[in-house]
Amino acid sequence: MPMGRFLSLVRGDSAESPREITSQSNIIGDTGSNGWLIRFFDSAFFCEWIAVSYLYKHPHAGVRDYLCNRMYTLPLSGIESYLFQICYMMVHKPSPSLDKFVIDICGKSLKIALKVHWFLLAELEDADDNEGISRIQEKCQIAATLMGEWSPLMRPQNEVSTPGSKNQVLNRLLSSKQKLFSLKLSPPTQKSLSFSPSPGTNVQDDGSQLPAEDNKIFKKLIPSPKVRDALMFRKSADKDDEESEKEGFFKRLLRDSKGEGDEPIPNSEGFFKRLLKDNKSEDEDITNSSEGFFKRLLSSKGESEELTSSSDGLFKRLLRDNKGDEEELGANSDSFFKRLLRESKNEDEESNPNSEGFFKKLFRDSKPEDDKVPKEVDDEDKDGFLKKLFREKNDDKRHGSEKNEANGTVYADKKSGEEDEREGFFKKFFKEKSDDKKDIVKVDDGNESEGDESPEFSLFKRLFRIHPEDAKPTSENENSSNGLVESSPGTENFFRKLFRDRDQSVEDSELFGSKKHKEKRPGSPKQRDDTPSGKPPLPNNTASQFRKGAYHESLEFVQALCETSYGLVDIFPIEDRKIGLRESLAEINFHLSEAEITGGICFPMGRGVFRVVHIPEDECILLNSREKAPYMISVEVLKAETPSAKESSNSQKLSKGGIPLANGDAFLQKPPPWAYPLWTTQEVYRNSADRMSLSTAQAIDQAMTPKSEVKVKLVNVSLSVEDRTSALESFGDPIDDVLGEAPRTGLNNDLEWVRVVVTADPGLRMESIPDPSVPRKKEHRRVPSTVAMEEVRAAAAKGEAPPGLPLKGAGQDSSDAQPRANGGMLKEGDALSGELWEGKRDRIRKASIYGKLPGWDLRSIIVKSGDDCRQEHLAVQLISHFYDIFQEAGLPLWLRPYEVLVTSSYTALIETIPDTASIHSIKSRYPNITSLRDFFVAKYKENSPSFKLAQRNFVESMAGYSLVCYLLQVKDRHNGNLLLDEEGHIIHIDFGFMLSNSPGGVNFESAPFKLTRELLEVMDSDADGVPSEFFDYFKVLCIQGFLTCRKHAERIILLVEMLQDSGFPCFKGGPRTIQNLRKRFHLSLTEEQCVSLVLSLISSSLDAWRTRQYDYYQRVLNGIL
């Protein structure tokens, strides 16, 4: 199937990005093989992993452009899990489309923008081309702050949000008919809208609040390209009154009225139609309330019975010399805007200074001109409204004001109060060069020669015309206006300034224009965040200020934490180091309170959007380290007030053990049924968790378990459905074998009955029943289900023996260890870390001043400096993928992914795992416990249901981490890097040595994984590997896990291969690192051979001598028990 077009994203001009590449050139090739690739990208198989992997494998620009366009349709949570690889490819495999995509997603998520900044900062410190990385980093920063679409972390305290309104001032302008759109004379004492250039918000006399920047009020009056198209092709569209209430402001503003014969209504008549309406129907009775906006405005300058002739264009009428004969109008006929624009110089006029109108302050000019005006209007409008509109730039150069041309707003900190009042709204938008007035007049004169079209329609054709590249012939009106495209430079200049979609700087073209000019085309990036949130957004100026503040304050917060860890290294002794840590945290807390004013500080880790409010100084813990000073802190956070709809709707996925998925939405999507061959559909979609081949399952059963006994059929059971009448008759029969009945209601509401008949087997004899001493069942339950886990928990709560678990251990009897354990002050139910996380959380919440606020939560992190933790981030990312692989296969192998956030090449934030303790700390705290089994017996009470459940959790986690340690060659596995949680799971941390590097450069830990005597004792085995139920369960889980990982070998290998040129210590082996990783998956072996392979790996790891010697070395050198 040939591919028609490729979508491409170009770094140069955002107005043309994404653009269509109409020439196929050599993208597809002669064979057209890439056509299948495009179909694959458009299928249901497409996900984040496919996008990232093909971005790495395919260097062709067309493929990368198409992939980046498709990535816009993927959820941000999935993209975030591969952000490390994406940023790495940005630096080492640059692509304009990839740069554009990363810049765009930085504007959609604050957490992504922060992580991109830190990832690029780490690469910036290593790379030689610092200018290119710094330029991308700056663009991402601008996209996240000035053009950000993410909701601010908090709202300003002095802002009141009104539901159903996007802007309070616009809402007031549109809804207040009496104050703004009525020609009735207002009393002198009427309260008017006041405007102030202060950066805050202004309170009206009647109590309502208004933003300060006047330009911000009208910035949305700039029509978008879609509105321009609607004006050209939908000029006379009929709309109901109900639809007019539901439609947006600009549709109601720019829509034409229903008909000229109907009675005009102010709200239903379009703004520009009233602006351009000719005075053809002079005899028609038009009331004050039905007159057009500008018609009423200009009525004081024209004749009372006729405004102008219909043949004159708009601007010619606007620029007409007002020296003509004008009749003196009385006070009752004064128009509304005439009163608003009345010169404030004359103190003896009817309106006093306190009643200055809203628009009067908008259009007020600070310096009067010396233009000559008739005496009739000298007291009313000295300079004239139109002269203010088209005032030339010569006085603007004297008062240079900095304007944000991207979104049409003027920041309060860059303008003084006099400049705010000096420049009116229309003056700013219609500001032109000195020859603009002449050009506009010439254009209007030229338009008079076109008699077929009305002057107002030709005006729209000139104003809202489409760029030649974007022009599409869809109607005869557009084809007839081809001559208007090549209009005068003055109009083109005017329009470029008004809509700012062509002549922009490089920064504007890539960042500021992307928000306005993304066009929806088939296959192009979809606007996923178009759905409005429940709360109205902030005005853009305030929102961008808050976004900018939150972005920079979050960066400074993390930098202060990391610099604290870096500075504590030089402080001795340790007691002074703890004092210095608390003093530094106190200073950080002071900055936290100040950051609340500028937008808050984002907590960059975990799910959801939270802002940091406080760090309890007394809860900080300085961790043990000889050369560095890592520390652990608890952080009080509050959930952001305006979370995105996607984050609030996504429920947190939990595993069987209650651990959230590390990858979240990044799961591989299940293809539709039609994508599979017919003979494999049922096999793929079956719900069974065991997906091994039949031969593999038979091999495991033959090696691990005895044959099951033969079942004896004792009874025959038959079911039948009868009508209510016949069922009742049979129910009355005393000679009936009905044991139970249940009513059932059919579709016709006739009552039916289900008859259950149980009869004994006539051919059964007592000799047929076997002896009760039959071989045991397969109690190891090769793939335990969630139901089985719940059975164990329920049985443990009742104090009964759970089904499917052995009652006695097959290993050594450790009953004599019970008094020693009790003597070590460890009691059943004691917390491993001294205090359970929930208890600590409740205690801190009660003591905190923020604890009663909604959305309060407590997070714990480790701040580490002095180490390059990018390798640690890669290891945790790989563990997350192994976790997802086991979850997709339905295997009970247990892993605990955690987050490592790299903030530079030598600093990082690490998520702490609550309610855990290392084996070393457990032995140190309870000196009378000499082995890990002693701890299990003391904590869970031997042979109790909780003890069996803890053993099961230990085995499932041991199997998962054993496979990970073998495949990734994780070293340095001493007891300080092995944690235990409250449920008995074992957790591995600290992945500084993996793949090809080892401690000291000597591969002393040569065993596939750590399986020492004390670990085997917990599984009811010993150093010789004596069979036991839990040890057999461990073997089966290792076999199933290894076979499942082989199916996803390319997924793991490619993820590592993407970073092989990064210079991480784990890649010091060069290309052999990837080759050896591939060999460890043994992709050439059959599944039966893999069973024998895994069993041999377990045998070689049983209490290996080198593993024991390494533990002894750590005990002697570092005191690790």
From Swiss-Prot:
Region: G-loop, residue numbers: 841-847
UniProt biased composition (Polar residues): 187-207, 476-489
SUPFAM superfamilies linked: ARM repeat, Protein kinase-like (PK-like)
PI3K/PI4K catalytic domain sequence ranges: 835-1106
Outcome of gene disruption: When associated with PI4KB2 disruption: aberrant root hair morphologies, and short and wavy pollen tubes.
Coiled-coil portions: none
PIK helical domain location: 1-143
Gene Ontology MF annotations: 1-phosphatidylinositol 4-kinase activity; protein histidine kinase binding; small GTPase binding
A Pfam family this chain is assigned to: PI3_PI4_kinase
GO biological process, one term: root hair cell tip growth
Record's subunit section: Interacts with AHK2, CBL1 and RABA4D.
Family stated for the protein in its record: Belongs to the PI3/PI4-kinase family. Type III PI4K subfamily.
Domain comment, as recorded: The PPC (Plant PI4K Charged) region is involved in membrane targeting and phospholipid binding.
Role noted for this protein: Acts on phosphatidylinositol (PtdIns) in the first committed step in the production of the second messenger inositol-1,4,5-trisphosphate. Necessary for proper organization of the trans-Golgi network (TGN) and post-Golgi secretion in root hairs. Together with PI4KB2, required during polarized root hair expansion and pollen tube elongation. Functions redundantly with PI4KB2 upstream of the cold response phosphoinositide-dependent phospholipase C (PI-PLC) pathway.
Protein's UniProt name: Phosphatidylinositol 4-kinase beta 1
Source organism: Arabidopsis thaliana
Lineage: Eukaryota, Viridiplantae, Streptophyta, Embryophyta, Tracheophyta
